[in-house]
């Protein structure tokens, strides 16, 4: 509906959300290549380099990240479509995600089989994503992963763990990382299990503060983490225990 063609590179610059996951799955169905970008990137060099290097034709962007794109929009003439996740006044050349969905429903009502044929025609060696390295020591490198890379990782992971369809997980890691991709939602989708994402706040700190409440709401069977995040969780728990007094802290240590 947006004119995106098979093989086109489409970036996603947004906080982790259900809309993020749905956007990428939609790109795969259209035969496009997803270019997930970290929300920590600054527009001056980091974003410009990656979007130019990947030859991005379109972009899904959250309302919180949109100001970055607006500041460099004139330097990205090859970007033809900007789809905005979230409610915010739009400028020329920007389309709300809700509008795109309506256009998509209308397109599918007239071209359903034509569209589904694109997805059926995707091969194992077709590109799925281009994920960029941090670029701390040199220019970032675009790591190309095929659809078979992902399905193989899912198969290998499921040979080591069992995920019943009744399981739930809450993704607290950035979705631009391959680990969150494979174990966070592709494994869950393959098993028919449930994926939830953290409620996005106006700032990264606000989003972090939503995690405990979201855990209580979702009651996940497991969480994905990385050492740095696990360390921060431990510090937060220990700080909370100490605040309750020596007796509580002593019982915690004994446990």
Annotate the PLM regions.
Residues 128-154:
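Conserved AMP-binding A3 loop
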Residues 2, 29-103:
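Structural core segment of the AMP-binding/adenylate-forming
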Residues 151-170, 175-255:
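Conserved AMP-binding/adenylation subdomain of ANL enzymes
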Residues 84, 101-132, 139, 162-168:
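Conserved pre-ATP/AMP-binding loop-to-beta segment of ANL
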Residues 14-15, 32-49, 63-68, 195-217:
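ATP-dependent adenylate-forming carboxylate-activation enzymes
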Residues 10, 27, 59, 127, ...:
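Conserved S/T- and glycine-rich ATP-binding loop of Class I adenylate-forming
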Residues 31, 135-136, 192:
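Conserved G/P- and acidic residue-centered "switch" motifs that form tight phosphate/ATP-binding loops
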Residues 1-41, 172:
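Conserved AMP-binding/adenylate-forming
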């Amino acid at each position: 509906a947006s004119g995106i063609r098979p093989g086109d590179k489409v970036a996603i610059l947004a906080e982790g959300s259900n809309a993020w996951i749905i956007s990428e799955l939609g790109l795969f169905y259209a035969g496009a290549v997803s270019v997930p970008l970290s929300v920590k990137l600054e527009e001056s060099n980091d974003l410009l380099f990656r979007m130019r290097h990947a030859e991005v034709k379109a972009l899904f962007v959250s309302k919180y990240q949109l100001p970055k794109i607006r500041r460099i929009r004139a330097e990205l003439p090859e970007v033809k479509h900007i789809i905005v996740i979230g409610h915010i006044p739009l400028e020329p050349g920007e389309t709300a995600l809700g509008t795109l969905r309506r256009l998509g429903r209308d397109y599918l009502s007239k071209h359903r089989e034509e569209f589904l044929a694109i997805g059926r025609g995707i091969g194992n060696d077709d590109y799925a994503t281009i994920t960029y390295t941090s670029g701390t020591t040199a220019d970032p490198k675009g790591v190309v992963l095929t659809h078979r890379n992902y399905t193989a990782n899912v198969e290998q992971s499921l040979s080591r763990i069992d995920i019943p369809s009744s399981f739930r997980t809450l993704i607290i890691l950035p979705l631009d990382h391959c680990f969150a991709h494979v174990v966070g939602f592709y494994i869950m989708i393959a098993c028919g299990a449930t994926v939830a994402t953290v409620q996005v706040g106006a700032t990264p700190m606000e989003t972090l503060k939503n995690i405990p409440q979201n855990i209580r709401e979702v009651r996940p069977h497991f969480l994905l983490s990385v050492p740095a995040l696990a360390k921060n969780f431990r510090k937060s728990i220990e700080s909370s225990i100490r605040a309750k007094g020596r007796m509580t802290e002593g019982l915690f240590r004994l446990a």
